[in-house]
Design a protein with these regions (language model features):
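N-terminal secretory signal peptides and thylakoid transit peptides that target proteins
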Residues: 1-19
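N-terminal Rossmann-like FAD-binding beta1-loop-alpha1 element of flavoenzymes
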Residues: 39-65
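Dinucleotide-binding Rossmann-like beta1-alpha1 core, especially the glycine-rich loop
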Residues: 87-185
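Active-site-proximal substrate-binding core of FAD-dependent oxidoreductases
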Residues: 545-587
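Conserved beta-strand-loop-beta-strand element in the redox core of flavoprotein oxidoreductases
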Residues: 305-325
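C-terminal segments that line or cap access tunnels to active or ligand-binding sites in enzymes
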Residues: 261-272, 299, 328-330, 335-504, ...
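Active-site/ligand-binding neighborhood in enzyme catalytic cores
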Residues: 176-308
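Glycine-rich FAD pyrophosphate-binding loop
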Residues: 59-80
């Protein structure tokens, strides 16, 4: 069934027509089918991984059908309308699972963005990326730390003398609270990582918690908060005490080189210049349709049929409860791991042991809430890390980046001027208002608690940054259900405790016509990200092309930047690792 939206580019997306006659008889309808020459592909999932796979396959002449359980495409990356908020010809207020963050360390996703046509943009949707010029580390009970970002799209906001005074106080206050020897020690620990060979990283550091690697337990509270807890919980949604050093340090290394301008696609921080569906997802789906890709939305995969060692069909249920069997020559599973593994029955799992290992992969909550304000509130020209907030909140004021929009003119009822979009990464610690975890709160309590935590970090040193009088409404990700004694989240995030990497599968499976894509698949970036989803889809397509004996050009899969200057250190460390010795810089 095709579902269209009336006010956004979501009107471009939806499913194809169901086979109603067979469904009406209570049978299982046949969707899509095998093609002459083995060119038909069923992509199971319509998020970043699924759309990337469809993109690469369709450009190589395959007949692609995408099946998505939600009523919209784009997965967790999509934006969405806030129901009932558009008036006077304006679009509904824009909501989202969480704000977009597309750093310069990404290479594969930006390549895809360049290949999505967008009117007036010579580089397609890539030209819709905009770089913030600064960031803010909000400290509760102290002055905040405001930092410029090299390569931003504009100069940082003008500093008043008071701004400068507060920034200097915040910087030195934090610096002096982290003893100099601890800063030096952290740098030395990072050198251990930078000079470690791949074998040591994958087999040793993968199994060491970041907390232990950085010796956080014996360090100051600020060392723990800034360099250990904040880096892991606010960014990778994993507790420092259990987060894999391999995952955290891989990300940290990439950002260091990005900040130095080495091997990057662009500045260290980028976001989109409009709501995501407008700037990216809508144009993407439109382009894929032009290539012949078909979409079924509201169709959930229930089972995979295995015959003769190959997948013969995928059993799906549409939004009306009717069952369909999607037949194709090739199948690409592109669902999040918590949903994908429910579709692998005993026969499918028996065909490839790596599928069963996926049951050990863990997910957690990292979910967004948006606050709609009656006044423009550009706190800083960039993201804010509320590093002391109990719920590990990050935020950004969005209207300042949407250059093609006047917020009041284009969205809502004409009185809303800004959207403060927040991500909540910690749902299991008590807040400051009710003494309850986010999962124990009602939706209304979550909104009030997040607002209070924002103010606690921003309004705590004599300034009123967020005024209660300008708060009009809020929107919490509808995938989250709270109340009634049970909290659920239909769109969770893969997390990376120690020992995760060996349980992550490869894109190629032992079933010759079945391939995996998604941010849980083993990829170079390691962290569950849009970049990882995109790269995994490219890997899956390459495996499919190889299995099909195709002469089509293979997808480019770009790895993170690794400086040649460090290769000699890594080679020597490989020898030490094989001899059972520690890294030469690892002195305890």
């Amino acid at each position: 069934m095709e579902r269209t939206g009336s006010t956004t580019r979501r009107g471009f997306i939806g499913g194809a027509t169901a086979v109603a006659a067979t469904a009406a008889l209570g049978g299982t309808a046949r969707a899509a089918g095998r093609s002459a020459g083995g060119r038909s592909v069923a992509v199971l999932g319509g998020g970043v991984a699924g759309l990337t796979a469809a993109h690469e396959l369709a450009e190589r002449g395959f007949k692609v059908t995408v099946y998505e359980r939600k009523d919209a495409l784009g997965g967790k990356a999509r934006s969405m309308d806030v129901p009932g908020t558009g008036a006077g010809g304006r679009r509904a207020l824009p909501g989202e699972h969480g704000f977009r963050f597309i750093p310069g360390i990404y290479h594969n996703l930006p390549d895809t963005l360049r290949r999505i046509p967008f009117p007036g943009n010579p580089n397609g949707c890539w030209d819709n990326l905009i770089a913030p010029s600064e960031t803010l580390v909000a400290r509760t009970g102290r002055e905040d730390i405001r930092l410029p970002i090299p390569g931003g799209s504009r100069r940082p906001s003008p500093l008043t003398l008071d701004d400068l005074r507060r920034t200097l106080i915040g910087f030195f206050e934090t610096s002096f609270r982290v003893p100099a020897y601890e800063v030096v020690y952290f740098a030395e620990r990072f050198l251990v990582w930078l000079t470690s060979c791949e074998e040591r990283r994958t087999r040793d550091w993968e199994n060491v918690p970041w907390w232990e690697f950085t010796r956080a337990a014996r360090m100051s509270a600020d060392y723990q908060r800034l360099l250990c807890i904040g880096l892991t919980r606010n960014i990778v949604a994993t507790k420092a005490e259990v987060a894999s050093t391999r995952t955290v340090a891989t990300l940290g290394e990439a950002f260091v080189f990005n900040g130095l301008g080495l091997g990057a696609d662009g500045p260290i921080d980028r976001l989109l210049n409009a709501p995501t569906n407008e700037a990216w997802i809508g144009p993407w789906v439109t382009y894929l349709r032009s290539l012949g890709v078909e979409f079924h939305t509201g169709w959930a995969v229930k089972d995979l049929q295995l015959e003769g060692g190959r997948i013969s069909g995928a059993v799906l249920e549409d939004s009306d409860g009717a069952r369909h069997t999607a037949e194709a020559d090739w199948f690409v599973s592109a669902m999040p791991v918590e949903h994908a593994r429910t579709t692998w029955n005993a026969d499918v799992r028996a065909a490839d042991p790596q599928l069963a290992r996926c049951d050990k992969l863990r997910t957690d909550w990292m979910t967004g809430i948006q606050f709609y304000l009656s006044e423009p509130t550009p706190i800083v020209h960039g993201h804010i890390n509320h590093i002391d907030s109990p719920w590990s909140i990050t935020s950004i004021s969005q209207a300042q980046f949407w250059s093609g929009h006047d917020f009041r003119r284009d969205f809502g009822d004409g009185t809303t001027a800004d959207c403060l979009s927040c991500d909540i990464s910690e749902w299991d610690k008590p807040g400051i208002l009710y003494g309850k975890t986010a999962k124990q709160c009602t939706r209304e309590e979550v909104a009030k608690e997040v607002w209070a935590q924002l103010k606690a970090g921003l309004d705590d040193t004599g300034r009123e940054v967020l005024k209660d009088s300008v708060l009009q409404s809020w929107f919490l990700d509808p995938a989250v259900q709270l109340g009634g004694g049970r909290a659920t989240n239909d769109e969770q995030l893969l997390i990376h405790p120690v020992g995760t990497w060996p349980n992550r599968p490869t894109s190629r499976t032992a079933i010759p016509n079945f391939f995996l894509s998604g941010d849980y698949v083993q990829v170079d970036i390691d962290l569950a990200t849009m970049e990882g989803a995109n790269a995994s889809a490219r890997q899956a397509v390459n495996a499919l092309l190889e299995e099909a004996g195709s002469g089509a050009e293979r997808c480019t899969v770009t790895s993170l930047y690794r400086p040649r200057e460090l290769e000699g250190f890594k080679q020597r460390d490989r020898l030490r690792w094989r001899l059972g010795l520690g890294n030469a810089f690892d002195v305890g």
